[in-house]
């Protein structure tokens, strides 16, 4: 059976959405709170049910309770094809082709439907064989037994991989047999048109799925006499950023006139021994850093202040630090210098101990976190830590709270403070994400990195002969290696710099820089050729326009332009590039002439140096053995022969006795 064209289009659209859905993942701070809306779509493409809440991603999995008649409204296969999900009534006129006792148009039909079981089959996450066996939309993905993964039937269909479970969220009636009796009994219990609610819960696999933003589709079929009828439903997650209304719309009930901030005036202090607070001539607001409004009548609608420039923001930052320092430590602001660092990091965090607030519902402050995680490279002090603190960061913790509890709670930092986590800077923490991950957070105060110096520090830089402590000097690679290519080796002989220039690594550095400059030259040459081609096209257009305005004296006369000519300076660029290429060739020849006949081997392949270094020692040892091995072996054999001869003589002497010798002339002389 060929499915309708609308079903084929919906199947293709859902397939494409499921394919890209796994790639849609919000990046940035995982504690960021969004407005999450779980929506259920019917087969006609309408949103029949939804629930909304403010939560962090992957933390809110509510039970979805749509009504079956909402999903069946508008379908030709049921008895309310002319109804929408929002205008269902107690009794509705059914269609003539749907005269079965089960349906949604009458209370007794709804009662009869509650006696039946239903089963659910998924469309997504199936392999090709299962999809072929279970069918498509026309069979509600349940064309064969065994395709069902959930439902509320007597055989209890289940699965280990499906994303949801669907059960009935109503009580099954005792009996709905007699129509007259049904009319009387069901007048009270089934008069509500939404009396067939379902309960959809998420499984562990569903909580790990990444395609909820594009949605997943299921087919639900009732176990009825004859052909099992059913519906198609789709579950989708909508993610929105929490917004706040700003504007002069007086229709809004909570519209309030913004308060215009002004600088608080410090009351005069009585003369005491303590130093007074230094006066500050400022027209800046300590909260916003914008100029204070001039006195006068207030405009009918609030006006937005102009955004200050970069210089104004930096000056406001320094002045805000001075105001704070002047108020807290007046002794330190008598004569000082505040210097804003010109290199990162621009902010520092100071760990503190404070009392955080536990919220059941996410406050508005939790939605103001930056999208991208901000990293603090300098955090000092001792403060409050939450989570699994690694050993490298335990020195920042004066008090550690390994676990606050379980549940969908949100921990907000006190006003003026932040949580700095391994995922970034945030004013709010989702407790569920903190417990499920290896995240950790530290309570900090955020301060701009501004150096404080006394007056003597600055004066010492300008007064001749002044003595002051020197700051550490930062040396770059250019300062460390400068002068090696110019032949000034005398200064580096004592530190072994002379050996550095002779190494192959330094020559490779020169070759790498040479290749980089050559690539730059090729890019400029390509740009020059493109410019020539463009100029040719422009000149062709110019000649064409001159022909069109020939009666007016040409294009320049028609435009009344005094200077109307083209100056081609690409020849200068071409000559410069030719000279640069010539210098490249000379430098390449110089590199090749300085290399020995064996040094060129190392430049042929990157692994040749490692191979030769690894095989050199065994080859040298083998060569020495072949050269001196025979001589050493001969001496060793000769030494062994001598030792064996001595041992053989000793063995022979043990088998004989020495005879007595006597002189025949002197028989009495016996030796």
Curated annotation (Swiss-Prot):
Keywords: Cleavage on pair of basic residues, Coiled coil, Disulfide bond, Fusion of virus membrane with host cell membrane, Fusion of virus membrane with host membrane, Glycoprotein, Host cell membrane, Host membrane, Host-virus interaction, Lipoprotein, Membrane, Palmitate, Signal, Transmembrane, Transmembrane helix, Viral attachment to host cell, Viral envelope protein, Viral penetration into host cytoplasm, Virion, Virus entry into host cell. Residues 292-305 have a biased composition (Pro residues). The record marks 470-471, 650-651 as: Cleavage. Specific enzymatic cleavages in vivo yield mature proteins. Envelope glycoproteins are synthesized as an inactive precursor that is N-glycosylated and processed likely by host cell furin or by a furin-like protease in the Golgi to yield the mature SU and TM proteins. The cleavage site between SU and TM requires the minimal sequence [KR]-X-[KR]-R. The R-peptide is released from the C-terminus of the cytoplasmic tail of the TM protein upon particle formation as a result of proteolytic cleavage by the viral protease. Cleavage of this peptide is required for TM to become fusogenic. Residues 633-671 are cytoplasmic. Residues 23-611 are extracellular. One of its GO terms (biological process) is symbiont entry into host cell. Residues 1-22 form the signal peptide. Disulfide bonds join 121-142, 134-147. InterPro entries: FMuLV_rcpt-bd, TLV/ENV_coat_polyprotein. The mature envelope protein (Env) consists of a trimer of SU-TM heterodimers attached by noncovalent interactions or by a labile interchain disulfide bond. The 17 amino acids long immunosuppressive region is present in many retroviral envelope proteins. Synthetic peptides derived from this relatively conserved sequence inhibit immune function in vitro and in vivo. This is Envelope glycoprotein. The lineage of its organism: Viruses, Riboviria, Pararnavirae, Artverviricota, Revtraviricetes. The gene is env.
